[in-house]
């Protein structure tokens, strides 16, 4: 039997593949999800198995047993409703499939029952002819199994079994009535077909009769017209007699056919009466079948009531046993309630302690955060102070350089003033000599220079060489100035980088000292606490601090290497760097001494605070001391900023003075050039003078103009 059911399941799976659903339906595991079956039902009757119902079927269920079970339940419920409401057939006589076995065990027997119900829906819907034709195209073995399943469904839908003995006669009567009904329906179809044929023959004969009657009328007319036709001796009479004989034969045949038609009509009426009787009998049998179904439903209800009564009796027995055990459970319940009360008190006390610990931890975290922020601010302010100190040193060096330049310019100004006075005196003497007529051009005293005795070519070459020497000297001075500025910029960059690295180095040393202090504190805590449960946390914290310490040391080593790389090659810069290193070492020693004093004062403050109130947080004293240091640093920074601003103002004033001096010198130089050009244009200089004499003549031309004018007026 199980083999037949498995063959039935496999054949029905092959039949289900003809629907060409989107979901796979090749194996039993593919069908356990229910997606392929729901899509096939939607193709069978889209009006009942609608799109909304199809959307409720989950497709991606995977191995989820619950989702598969829900899908199969929805499909089975919809099929049963389809049989009851659309096909008007009760499914009480058909064993419904066990869906749990289908989902969990992939049972082919139960799956075959479900597929058999789907097959019944297909062969009983509006498109049953199409699906029957599809079944006929399958293989013979599959077709035979599918037809057997259809016959089983058809046999089960006829009548339902009532019980044991009285149901046998009714079943036989129903089977016999169904056989008679099928025979009568077949005979009815044959008689209807025969009636159609006879009707066609009657119509043909009536047409022939009408045509013959028309011919008969024509012949009677002709017979009336031609009385000679009555004479049989004439050929027309013989023809008339023959036609009359044929007419009589046709009339007899017509009468015979009408009699046969009447006989067939009577026989058809009798068959219709028999069909009406059989329909009444079929209605009676269907009413009996409905009564049998209702009786079977009542029998099933009574059986379920009896089963329920048995279950209730068993449950009553179990409840009695449970009531017997209830007293023990109550005693245990009381004991558990007492334990629960004790546990509740313990939990309340522990929660209070935990709340206090959390509050203390939060306060400690805030203090730690404040300390870290203050450390960060201190490092930033110290870096800023170092930068300001470096800027101040730079400004001081610039100031010293400007003071030296000012002294040099003042010395040069004094020398120029002296030369100017000498030139004025000589000019005054020359003017007096010219006025007195004692100073004549071309005299031996005027040509007292050795250069004037040289030829003109040598003088021109000498002048050109002097000009080239001057230009080369100017180019060399410009290149030396550019080189000096580049070296000064490199020195400033090196100093700035060194100061930055020094500040970073100092901050890293401070951080290392703090980390070492924290490591020592943690080691002391580990030694004091011994085997407490939070040793792992302290060890992790110690390891983290050690890692930070190693990183800080590595960073210091890298910055030391950078400092070594930034050592200048020039001797002057090396000397200055040595001086700066000495000053830096001195500052480092001062900083170490200050740090030692700070640590000593900090330890003393901690001891005092602990001695006063051990419950207070030790971080508050550190915070206060750091705040004091920050305020001192702020004051120092403000003072340095003021000094820096004053130095900038002094530098700006010195720059203004220098620019005014340079502008004045440029104006004097322009005036001299203009006087030279005007002198050459007027050709006032005699051709026999030397270059220096020409220069003196050009420079003194303007001054002599003011003296010559009043002299000429007096003459």
UniProtKB/Swiss-Prot annotation:
| Keyword annotations of the record | Coiled coil, Cytoplasm, Cytoskeleton, Microtubule, Protein transport, Transport
Report the subcellular localization. Answer: Cytoplasm; Cytoplasm, Cytoskeleton
Q: Which GO terms describe its cellular component?
A: centrosome; cytoplasm; FHF complex; microtubule
According to the UniProt entry, its GO molecular function terms are:
dynein light intermediate chain binding; microtubule binding
Q: Name one GO biological process term.
A: early endosome to late endosome transport
Q: Where is the Calponin-homology (CH) domain?
A: 6-122
* Residue intervals passing through the bilayer: none
Coiled-coil residues are: 167-434, 463-656
On assembly, the entry states: Interacts with microtubules.
Q: Which family does it belong to?
A: Belongs to the hook family.
Describe the function of this protein. Answer: May function to promote vesicle trafficking and/or fusion.
Q: What is this protein called?
A: Protein Hook homolog 1
Task: Write down the species.
Answer: Danio rerio
């Amino acid at each position: 039997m199980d083999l037949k059911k498995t063959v039935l399941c496999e054949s029905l799976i092959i039949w289900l593949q003809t629907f060409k659903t989107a979901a796979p339906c090749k194996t039993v595991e593919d069908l356990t999800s229910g997606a392929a079956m729901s899509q096939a039902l939607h193709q069978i009757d889209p009006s009942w198995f609608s799109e909304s119902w199809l959307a409720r079927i989950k497709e991606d269920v995977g191995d989820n047993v619950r989702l598969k079970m829900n899908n199969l339940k929805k499909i089975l419920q919809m099929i049963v409703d389809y049989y009851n409401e659309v096909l008007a057939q009760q499914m009480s006589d058909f064993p419904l499939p066990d869906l749990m076995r289908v989902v969990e065990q992939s049972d082919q027997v139960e799956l075959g029952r479900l597929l058999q119900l789907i097959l019944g829906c297909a062969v009983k819907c509006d498109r049953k002819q199409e699906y029957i034709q599809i079944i006929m195209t399958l293989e013979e073995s599959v077709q035979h199994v599918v037809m057997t399943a259809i016959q089983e469904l058809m046999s089960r839908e006829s009548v339902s079994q009532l019980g044991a003995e009285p149901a046998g006669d009714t079943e036989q009567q129903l089977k016999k009535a169904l056989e008679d009904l099928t025979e009568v329906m077949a005979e009815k179809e044959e008689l209807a077909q025969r009636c159609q044929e006879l009707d066609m023959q009657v119509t043909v004969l009536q047409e022939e009769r009408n045509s013959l009657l028309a011919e008969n009328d024509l012949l009677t007319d002709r017979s009336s017209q031609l009385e000679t036709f009555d004479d049989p001796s004439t050929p027309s009479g013989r023809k008339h007699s023959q036609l009359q004989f044929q007419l009589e034969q046709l009339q007899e045949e017509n009468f015979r056919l009408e009699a046969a038609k009447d006989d067939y009509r009577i026989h058809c009426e009798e068959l219709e009466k028999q069909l009406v009787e059989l329909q009444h009998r079929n209605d009676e049998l269907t009413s009996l079948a409905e009564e049998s179904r209702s009786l079977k439903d009542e029998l099933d209800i009574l059986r379920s009531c009896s089963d329920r009564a048995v279950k209730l009796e068993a449950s009553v027995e179990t409840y009695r046993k449970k009531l017997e055990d209830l007293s023990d459970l109550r005693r245990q319940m009381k004991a558990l309630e007492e334990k629960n009360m004790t546990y509740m008190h313990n939990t309340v006390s522990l929660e209070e302690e935990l709340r206090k610990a959390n509050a203390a931890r939060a306060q400690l975290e805030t203090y730690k955060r404040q300390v870290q922020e203050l450390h960060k601010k201190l490092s930033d302010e110290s870096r800023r102070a170092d930068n300001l100190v470096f800027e101040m040193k730079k400004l001081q060096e610039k100031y010293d350089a400007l003071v030296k330049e000012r002294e040099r310019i003042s010395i040069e100004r004094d020398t120029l003033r002296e030369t100017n006075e000498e030139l004025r005196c000589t000019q005054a003497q020359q003017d007096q000599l010219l006025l007195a007529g004692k100073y004549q051009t071309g005299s031996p005293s005027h040509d007292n220079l050795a250069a004037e005795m040289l030829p003109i070519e040598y003088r021109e070459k000498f002048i050109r060489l002097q000009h080239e020497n001057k230009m080369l000297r100017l180019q060399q001075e410009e290149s030396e100035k550019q080189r000096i500025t580049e070296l000064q910029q490199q020195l400033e960059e090196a100093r700035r980088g060194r100061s930055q690295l020094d500040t970073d180095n100092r901050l890293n040393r401070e951080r290392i000292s703090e980390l070492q202090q924290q490591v020592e504190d943690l080691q002391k805590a580990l030694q004091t606490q011994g085997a407490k449960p939070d040793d792992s946390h302290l060890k992790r914290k110690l390891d983290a601090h050690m890692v930070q310490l190693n990183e800080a040391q590595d960073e210091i080593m890298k910055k030391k290497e950078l400092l070594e790389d930034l050592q200048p090659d020039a001797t002057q810069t090396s000397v200055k760097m040595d001086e700066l290193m000495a000053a830096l070492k001195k500052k480092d020693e001062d900083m170490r001494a200050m740090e030692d004093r700070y640590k000593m004062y900090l330890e003393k403050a901690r001891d005092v605070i602990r001695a006063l109130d051990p419950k207070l947080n030790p971080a508050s004293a550190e915070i206060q001391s750091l705040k004091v240091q920050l305020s001192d640093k702020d004051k120092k920074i403000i003072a340095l900023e003021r000094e820096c601003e004053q130095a900038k103002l002094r530098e700006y004033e010195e720059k203004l003075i220098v620019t005014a001096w340079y502008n004045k010198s440029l104006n004097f130089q322009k005036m001299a050039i203009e006087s030279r050009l005007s002198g050459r244009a007027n050709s006032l200089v005699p051709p026999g003078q030397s270059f220096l004499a020409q220069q003196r003549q050009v420079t003194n031309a303007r001054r002599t103009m003011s003296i010559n004018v009043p002299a000429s007026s007096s003459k």
